[in-house]
């Protein structure tokens, strides 16, 4: 439907649920109508797509320019039909380099009482569970946001959230496994005691 309404649009998917081997990736591209897949963490690959898109002067040129060559951190279906990968370091080691979507105000409009806020305190998983896509070697290094960053987000959220919101989602793969997680729990408890 998207391409019917916008034939020059680019279909971009991303996330961890992508085959690790190239033959399976080719089959994935045959099965689904996508142009670009951004594996693992998305900030670098998606930023590279946006940077290339900003160089396009008209919507009619979008597909031609963006899909003309590979994009660092992405797997792309090029204009000639080839599936190509340009590898880059898609994992950000210092997660605090990523601006907070909360403290920058980007998520303020979603504090409407309909949604629950979600935070992430670390990325990666040290385990290699065969049933889990996150058990791969590419994400077994744990990278963490600093406790200060998480605390700042929690306090910001507590000042913005509506009184009918009773949940906070933590999207870590293994929250509670690291000593700093207790500090985060203490901050949550402190905020609850103050706000309730």
Model feature map: region roles:
Residues 1-88:
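Glycine-rich beta-alpha loop elements in corrinoid/cobalamin-binding modules
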Residues 67-69, 91, 112, 163:
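A generic structural signal for short, non-catalytic loop/turn and secondary-structure boundary residues
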Residues 88-95:
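A short, sequence-level motif marking secondary-structure junctions
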Residues 25-26, 53, 92, 101, ...:
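Amphipathic, positively biased hydrophobic alpha-helical segments used for protein targeting
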């Amino acid at each position: 439907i998207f391409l019917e309404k916008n034939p020059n649009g680019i279909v971009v998917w991303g996330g961890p649920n992508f085959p690790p081997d190239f033959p399976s990736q080719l089959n994935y591209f045959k099965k689904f109508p996508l142009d670009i897949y951004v594996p693992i963490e998305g900030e670098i690959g998606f930023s590279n797509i946006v940077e290339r898109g900003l160089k396009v002067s008209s919507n009619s040129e979008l597909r031609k320019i963006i899909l003309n060559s590979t994009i660092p951190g992405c797997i792309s279906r090029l204009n000639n039909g080839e599936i190509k990968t340009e590898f880059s370091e898609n994992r950000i080691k210092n997660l605090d380099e990523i601006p907070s979507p909360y403290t920058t105000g980007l998520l303020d409009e979603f504090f409407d009482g309909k949604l629950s806020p979600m935070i992430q305190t670390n990325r990666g998983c040290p385990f290699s569970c065969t049933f889990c896509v996150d058990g791969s070697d590419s994400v077994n290094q744990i990278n963490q946001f600093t406790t200060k960053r998480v605390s700042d987000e929690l306090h910001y959220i507590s000042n913005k959230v509506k009184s009918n919101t009773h949940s906070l989602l933590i999207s870590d793969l293994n929250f509670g496994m690291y000593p700093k997680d207790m500090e985060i729990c203490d901050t949550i408890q402190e905020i609850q005691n103050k706000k309730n």
